[in-house]
Amino acid sequence: MATILFLSLLFLSCILLAAFTHKKRQQHQRKPPSPPGFPIIGNLHQLGELPHQSLWRLSKKYGHVMLLKFGSIPTVVVSSSETAKQVLKIHDLHCCSRPSLAGPRALSYNYLDIAFSPFDDYWKELRRICVQELFSVKRVQSFQPIKEDEVKKLIDSVSESASQGTPVNLSEKFTSLTVRVTCKATFGVNFQGTVLNSDRFEKLIHDTYLFLGSFSASDYFPNGGWIIDWLTGLHGQRERSVRALDAFYEQMFDLHKQGNKEGVEDFVDLLLRLEKEETVIGYGKLTRNHIKAILMNVLIGGIGTSAITMTWAMTELMRNPRVMKKVQSEIRNQIGKKSMITLDDIDQLHYLKMVINETWRLHPPSPFLIPRQVMSEFELNDYVIPVKTRLYVNVWAIGRDPDTWKDPEEFLPERFVNSSIDAKGQHFELLPFGSGRRMCPAMYMGTTMVEFGLANMLYHFDWKIPVGMVAEDIDLEESPGLNASKKNELVLVPLKYLDH
């Protein structure tokens, strides 16, 4: 009897072991669909000049969850609102860290910032400070006089062009506006007397965006890719940009110590005060390098994104005269006669907000959210996503998903009428600021900049296309790089709106 019982238990154990082994083998095989690649480089050759568009096209064949091999790095790309929800909400804690990337590492003084640092206690404490101190609604509202002053200068500049009948480069105007507002709010000073004038600073920021969006071999071949970066000159370009930014930060610190500034407490004032108070972040005290890394996030995140959105919005409005007429009528009928629209006025401009949402849907400033790194294995659409997988959310593709959006290629702000979808991170159909733990903490600051700048340009001026062009000549080509900016600058002729 004992022998029979022993043999029965042994047989049952063998069956259970075989079933467990088979299940583990099945799990190992449950990888997302993957396009064929080449040895060593994997799928790098399929990225193209505009990776978000290339991967969108691949997702049509291989699905909304797609596995690729970029060099030696296993990478998963998700391209639908449902899979984005699983990544950013349901499995957020499994994959909310960041991969090690050469450009961000150099700019952030070895990951002392909030955008690119890995998920740990240091990051949690830093985010708390940023949310409660730097980007709170109260602090952002304290910068409103700066926005009003700079938008007034923009209105005066465009008015002068209107009186002369000369075209205006709106791409440049919007970039200059966001540079001035961001720098005044961050540093409390203009460029006069600093190591950088406005033009040089804008070029430095442009070059920084360029190398962040450039192919860096060390990001895909950690063991030897740095050699390629040296040979291509990318490493040198990166080092020069970092040194130039560092010199600028140091001069800003000196100006603040001398008290050579005016206005409300800016970001540098706040951070220097926290340094003086010996604020502890993570395992150490706040240092100058911490402050520089945070300032880098403010500059890189604040300057390009708002200008890009305003430029794309004006581009789409010029291509869609019906929408232009409707949004200008709303603004002018609601506001009446004023020298400038205020933030309180903007709360009444519902169609303008729809125009901005529709712009974010078709033209998210960052077509991919900053890549994540998987910290613990999880399942996504029944596929196993292993530890150390690099994960991208293709926001650009989500905005064009026909399963979510009817006629996705049409610019149609009315699709947001009676819709609960907004850009605040709770609706995964629209993710210009991301969602989850790594959502952009400066969302309110960015949104108000776009609303305020765009509303005043639409209120004060009518716009026409330069002589010899038609609406269809205004193209939608995107520039390669970190952000999906308009490749060809938007140049329009302003006409002063006289009824105020």
Curated annotation (Swiss-Prot):
It is found in: Membrane. It is an enzyme of class 1 (oxidoreductase). Gene3D superfamilies: Cytochrome P450. The keyword Cytoplasm does not apply. The chain crosses the membrane at residues 1-21. Keywords: Heme, Iron, Membrane, Metal-binding, Monooxygenase, Oxidoreductase, Transmembrane, Transmembrane helix. InterPro entries: Cyt_P450 (IPR001128), Cyt_P450_CS (IPR017972), Cyt_P450_E_grp-I (IPR002401), Cyt_P450_sf (IPR036396). SUPFAM superfamilies: Cytochrome P450. One of its GO terms (cellular component) is membrane. It comes from the Eukaryota. Heme binds at C440. Its main location: membrane. One of its GO terms (molecular function) is monooxygenase activity. It is a single-pass membrane protein. Its EC number is 1.14.-.-. Belongs to the cytochrome P450 family. This is Cytochrome P450 71B36. It comes from Arabidopsis thaliana.
